Amino acid sequence: MENEFSPNIPIYIQVMECIKKEIVTGRLAPGNKIPAVRELASELQVNPNTIQRTFQELEREGIAVTRRGTGRFVTSEGEKITELRKEMATEL
């Protein structure tokens, strides 16, 4: 993932868009584990609270799910992934 962030858009939204792109392109497939908060924060050089906020929003949108004790994963709901692909296609 890239860590060149625009000052005009909140970082958590930019990180969320990066994760969505990885899902749409297949780098993160349905059911795949999403990197841990600290791991992703370190990789992107951002505050862990920013990544936590990103994950909360992804869960709210139904794109990510938390499995207690094992971490966060891309949803296995094919309908949600298809919806995300359509949404991102219209943005291009």
Which residues are covered by each model-predicted region?
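Short secondary-structure transition/capping segments
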Residues: 44, 78-79
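Short, Lys/Arg-rich nucleic-acid/phosphate-binding segment
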Residues: 34, 63-74, 78
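Extreme N-terminal segment that seeds HTH/winged-HTH DNA-binding domains in transcriptional regulators
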Residues: 1-33, 39, 83-90
